């Protein structure tokens, strides 16, 4: 049995989070309640020297009090292999800085259990991983070829155009067949993004909400429905979407059954998927949100279920 004592959280700085809706805070608060020592560091404090992985960390104490939610000790440099668990929880963009951190953390995983598995996080970008389940998705095009995008829009009518590696609803546009700004939109994307873009058929069901379903070790444990603002195509809570309680439909349960084995095979202990109507649009493996909202609406204590799964995983390890 590999008992957990020390837990490091690689995250955006704790001073900047909104504790009312932050899943990293919920995960960390549950770890603290279980008696683990918490260590906080931001991605830029991660380093490798002579083959060993270090970070400049602060021991962290949390309080569920707005405006007074954390205390940090003096910084110290530690060998991250001395940690039992590390949570990879900084927000995207999924850029080379993010990818580099997965390469470094891969050096100490799984002896130090990194959640989620850093190699598979690197190899499973949210908007690309989901295409492995093409029959569960809306019609989708990934390209930077503007003629292909124009052809796709002519076939689909209304489309959604978004950056391939964005997050939080940033850069998401709804373009109708007769949109006179379409050429300008493609020009803007060409100036802003070096990578291909993703275009998807517009799903009118988004007006009823975009469902975020949370899975722990491949099993659904909670969900919220995110309803977009009246004049916005985006339902992300970062973009003004309104969360509301919900239950899983038979179709959504089927989607979870289909993807569960792939999540477990890749070591994804905590995942959030997005579903509009009958279609899955993303599999979020970097820093899924929604834990506090699920709990607020009377759903499961997802943070507790996640730590149960982590403890089970550690117990199965034999070092």
Curated annotation (Swiss-Prot):
Source organism of this protein record: Agrobacterium fabrum (strain C58 / ATCC 33970) (Agrobacterium tumefaciens (strain C58))
Keyword terms of this UniProt record: ATP-binding, Glutathione biosynthesis, Ligase, Magnesium, Manganese, Metal-binding, Nucleotide-binding
Swiss-Prot/TrEMBL catalytic activity: gamma-L-glutamyl-L-cysteine + glycine + ATP = glutathione + ADP + phosphate + H(+)
EC id: 6.3.2.3
Cofactor(s) this protein cannot do without: Mg(2+); Mn(2+)
EC category: ligase
PROSITE patterns: ATP_GRASP
Protein name from the UniProt record: Glutathione synthetase
Annotated HAMAP family: GSH_S (MF_00162)
Xref: Gene3D superfamilies: 3.40.50.20, ATP-grasp fold, A domain, ATP-grasp fold, B domain
Residues involved in ATP binding: 153-209
GO cellular component, one term: cytoplasm
Superkingdom of source: Bacteria
Functional pathway: Sulfur metabolism; glutathione biosynthesis; glutathione from L-cysteine and L-glutamate: step 2/2
GO MF terms held by the record: ATP binding; glutathione synthase activity; metal ion binding
Family: Belongs to the prokaryotic GSH synthase family.
Matches recorded under InterPro entries: ATP-grasp (IPR011761), ATP_grasp_subdomain_1 (IPR013815), Glut_synth_pro (IPR006284), GSHS_ATP-bd (IPR004218), GSHS_N (IPR004215), PreATP-grasp_dom_sf (IPR016185)
UniProt remark on cofactor binding: Binds 1 Mg(2+) or Mn(2+) ion per subunit.
Binding-site residues, Mg(2+): 282, 284
Record-annotated ATP-grasp domain positions: 127-311
């Amino acid at each position: 049995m590999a008992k957990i004592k020390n837990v490091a959280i690689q995250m955006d700085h704790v001073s900047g989070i909104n504790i009312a809706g932050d899943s990293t805070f919920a995960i960390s608060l549950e770890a603290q309640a279980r008696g683990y020592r918490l260590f906080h560091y931001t991605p830029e404090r991660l380093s490798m020297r002579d083959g060993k992985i270090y970070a400049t960390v602060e021991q962290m104490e949390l309080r569920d009090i707005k405006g007074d939610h954390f205390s940090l000790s003096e910084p110290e440099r530690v060998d991250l292999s001395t940690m039992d668990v590390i949570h990879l929880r900084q927000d995207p963009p999924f850029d080379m800085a993010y990818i580099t951190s997965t390469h470094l953390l891969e050096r100490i995983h799984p002896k130090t259990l990194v959640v989620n598995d850093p190699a598979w996080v690197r190899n499973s970008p949210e908007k690309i991983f989901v295409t492995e389940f093409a029959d569960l998705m809306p019609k989708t095009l990934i390209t930077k070829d503007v003629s292909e995008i124009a052809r796709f829009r002519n076939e689909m009518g209304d489309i959604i155009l978004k950056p391939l590696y964005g997050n939080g609803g940033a850069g998401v546009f709804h373009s109708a067949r007769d949109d006179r700004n379409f050429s300008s939109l493609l020009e803007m994307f060409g100036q802003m993004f070096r990578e291909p873009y993703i275009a998807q058929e517009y799903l009118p069901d988004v007006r009823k909400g975009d469902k975020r379903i949370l899975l722990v070790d491949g099993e659904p444990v909670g969900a919220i429905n995110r309803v977009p603002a009246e004049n916005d195509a985006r339902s992300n809570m970062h973009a003004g979407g309104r969360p509301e309680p919900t239950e899983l439909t038979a179709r959504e349960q089927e989607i979870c059954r289909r993807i569960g084995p792939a999540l477990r095979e890749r070591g994804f202990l905590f995942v959030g998927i997005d579903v509009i109507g009958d279609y899955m649009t993303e599999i979020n493996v970097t820093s899924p949100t929604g834990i506090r909202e699920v709990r607020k609406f009377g759903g499961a204590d997802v943070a507790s279920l996640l730590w149960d799964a982590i403890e089970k995983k550690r117990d199965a390890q034999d070092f």
